[in-house]
């Protein structure tokens, strides 16, 4: 007869569940990607391994509200709260994209208490590469 599988939420195997590896990170990199439709904030260590991330969509904003500055501020606050608890004190900020959430996300990062070593704009700019799509007629 087959053995019954243990329940996932049972009291016996509560230490067996996967638990996120909590490690002390003194310095990290905060990547902010602000498009017109959404803002994604990713916190990595200096080697580029993702520690925490958040976006306006995961914070509960839907549709056109995801592109607002308030949604970007909320997403940045959510992503940074976890790394501040892990002990991050210094960070570099890389901002990419033309969206409305750029400044709001940066304001939320400044308010978090992390010392910023530098803020860099890494928006990709073509040196007259591909032809852009035709202009919208509304």
Swiss-Prot record:
It is found in: Plastid, Chloroplast. It comes from Morus indica (Mulberry). InterPro entries: Ribosomal_uS11, Ribosomal_uS11_bac-type, Ribosomal_uS11_CS, Ribosomal_uS11_sf. The gene is rps11. GO terms for cellular component: chloroplast; ribonucleoprotein complex; ribosome. It holds the Pfam family Ribosomal_S11. The keyword Cytoplasm does not apply. It comes from the Eukaryota. This is Small ribosomal subunit protein uS11c. GO terms for molecular function: rRNA binding; structural constituent of ribosome. Keywords: Chloroplast, Plastid, Ribonucleoprotein, Ribosomal protein, RNA-binding, rRNA-binding. Its main location: plastid. One of its GO terms (biological process) is translation. PANTHER family: 40S RIBOSOMAL PROTEIN S14/30S RIBOSOMAL PROTEIN S11. Belongs to the universal ribosomal protein uS11 family. Part of the 30S ribosomal subunit. SUPFAM superfamilies: Translational machinery components.
């Amino acid at each position: 007869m087959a053995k019954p599988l243990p329940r996932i939420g049972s009291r016996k195997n509560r230490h067996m569940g996967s638990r996120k590896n909590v490690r002390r990170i003194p310095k990290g990199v905060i990547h902010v990607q602000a498009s017109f439709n959404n803002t994604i904030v990713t916190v990595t260590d200096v080697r580029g391994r993702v520690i925490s991330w958040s976006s306006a969509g995961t914070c509960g904003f839907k549709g056109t509200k995801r592109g607002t500055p308030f949604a970007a501020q909320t997403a940045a606050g959510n992503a940074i709260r976890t790394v501040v608890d892990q002990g991050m004190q210094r960070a570099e900020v890389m901002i990419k994209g033309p969206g409305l959430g750029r400044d709001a996300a940066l304001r939320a990062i400044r308010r978090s208490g992390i010392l910023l070593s530098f803020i860099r704009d890494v928006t990709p700019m073509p040196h007259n590469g591909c032809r852009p799509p035709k202009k919208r007629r509304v």
